[in-house]
Amino acid sequence: MRGCLQSVKWLTSALRPSQSLASSTRYPRRLLSTSAPRNAQVRKPASEVEQRIAAIPIERFRNFCIVAHVDHGKSTLSDRLLELTGTIEAGANKQVLDKLDVERERGITVKAQTCSMLYNHQGEDYLLHLVDTPGHVDFRAEVSRSYASCGGALLLVDASQGIQAQTVANFYLAFAEGLKLVPVINKVDLPSADPQRALDQMKNTFELDPESAVLVSAKTGLNVSQLLPTVIEQIPAPVGDRTKPLRMLLVDSWYSTYKGVILLVRLFDGEIRAGDQVVSFATGLKYTVGEVGIMYPGRTAQSVLRAGQVGYIYFNPAMKRSQEAKVGDTYTKVGSERLVQPLPGFEEPKAMVFVAAYPVDASDFPHLEDSINQLILNDRSVTLQKESSEALGAGFRLGFLGTLHCSVFEDRLRQEHGASIIITPPTVPFKVIWKDGKEEIITNPALFPEEDTLRAKVTELQEPFVLATLTFPEEYLGRVIELCESNRGEQKSLEFFTSTQVILKYELPLAQLVDDFFGKLKGSTKGYASLDYEESGWRRSNISKLQLLVNKVPVDAVSRVVHSSQVQRLGRLWVSKFKEHVDRQMFEVVIQAAAGRNVVARESIKPFRKDVLQKLHAADVTRRKKLLEKQKEGRKKLKAVGNVVIEHKAFQAFLAK
């Protein structure tokens, strides 16, 4: 028996080397047969890109953006440039840099998006960094941040429409930042195109040399190949020194479920790699870099980012709190804090339009809060404050740069986060000047002083005005002036910058501008007008708080500060619309709109009525009157003590657009 056991042990020990040898030879072979090709597919392009980038000095970097009026072809031109450089396949996608669903649905750019490109010019590789910027005035903050990453810009003008209001605004914004501007005339293939008129407008309005302009069709690709050599020759390379301590600007950020907060950064000096320890100047918090890379066009990991580049980083452990990522913040390596001067950052945009947002189901409040915080991480121009309503429960007071900004944010909440929300109509801030000299900005109508307080303690009420620039064909001049005058506007200037195009400037109350002014303007000009505006200070105004009362009890979710000229119209609209959504009660329901102590409109909902005369003889008049009086008295008592039951869906329907 013992001999058998020894034989087994000997055989086992004898077999082990061969087994381990066989397994060691077979196992790597199995690894190579499965994972190596997959790694080759993923890593080979990245390594080729990285090798090419490593060989390019900063003198052959070019950072540029495309700026234009909305719908002049920025995103389509971006697609053609990405195809030309081989970053994407030709015809593989449309509007690659319009990544949000709402951008594709509306056909506008909302978020400034970035992409790095490699381009060989005269035998030398160049690293080009492209930023596709929004055109609408509501997203001006996105445009301003984009300029911090760029040394120049392609100023794009539609050959059929010419210079528009936001072309002018974006030009002066880029000019103020010191960007080198390259004029580009787009859509020259259209039958209605007039490139010479657009060139003349650029020369007369911006003093840009027509000889330096490039005439293209982004849709067909005509002359697009001439753009990149022009960018290389005319736009300067970024300035930076990779041997200096790291100095890195946070340009944008977004949230990933697995990576935490991802930062889009522009390196002014130094280098950054995975594993580096960095510190924020704004918060003092320290982080370990988990990965660095470029957008090509999606996230493409790199071993290093150098001075002059724009790329992304995320940390390990991840940055989980969105409040830590402050756009405009400067980062450097731990230990270099005293050697680095922080960058100036960005001017904080001021919210101009405010709404209240409530979840349809009160139990969804935590989900709504989390969704809003994630969106604000990607859009820092939104302001946020918690508030509550007796009618609608817990919610938020949100501030935006304009009504389109608000509408897009609402769409993103619904599409990207599945939020079911109730949004109140947009309002603007108002200024209260108290008799003791203090000034207060009111953004929530519920906090507006009551009538007695206004008389006793307030010196003056003011509302914000804007300077609106409107461009449109000359034939609609009369209609546009009439529209502006009916909205309490004051004309400032009128000029013809071509024989048929007009630039009209009006000072308008911001409250009128957010009340679908742009929609009315489009209607008056058959869609040919464009609008841009900027702040124009505060003015004294005759304003009051309009409230909705149900049986003399104010409904806190429905109140608004309006000019005296709007009180009657809005009051009548409110009571008639609210009446449609309130169910009948056992007693009469009175719906009123009141400005201060003055009731400006009223509607009544008749109660359910029981036929108390059903069993009476037709000739019994005395008994008939007695029963009707008794029913009437009973209703009065019920009305005095009863509460009106208003369903949550009634508010939802009333506040719906």
UniProtKB/Swiss-Prot annotation:
MF (Gene Ontology): GTP binding; GTPase activity; mitochondrial ribosome binding
Assigned EC number: 3.6.5.-
Gene3D superfamilies: 3.30.70.240, Elongation factor 4, C-terminal domain, Elongation Factor G (Translational Gtpase), domain 3, P-loop containing nucleotide triphosphate hydrolases, Translation factors
InterPro entries: EF-4, EFG_III/V, EFG_V-like, G_TR_CS, LepA_C_sf, LepA_CTD, LepA_IV, P-loop_NTPase
Binding site for GTP: 121-128, 185-189, 239-242
Membrane topology: Peripheral membrane protein
Any single Gene Ontology cellular-component annotation: mitochondrial matrix
Residues covered by the tr-type G domain: 59-239
Record's catalysed reaction(s): GTP + H2O = GDP + phosphate + H(+)
Subcellular location: Mitochondrion inner membrane
Protein family (similarity comment): Belongs to the TRAFAC class translation factor GTPase superfamily. Classic translation factor GTPase family. LepA subfamily.
Function noted in UniProt: Promotes mitochondrial protein synthesis. May act as a fidelity factor of the translation reaction, by catalyzing a one-codon backward translocation of tRNAs on improperly translocated ribosomes. Binds to mitochondrial ribosomes in a GTP-dependent manner.
PANTHER family xrefs: TRANSLATION FACTOR GUF1, MITOCHONDRIAL, TRANSLATION FACTOR GUF1-RELATED
Protein name as catalogued: Translation factor GUF1, mitochondrial
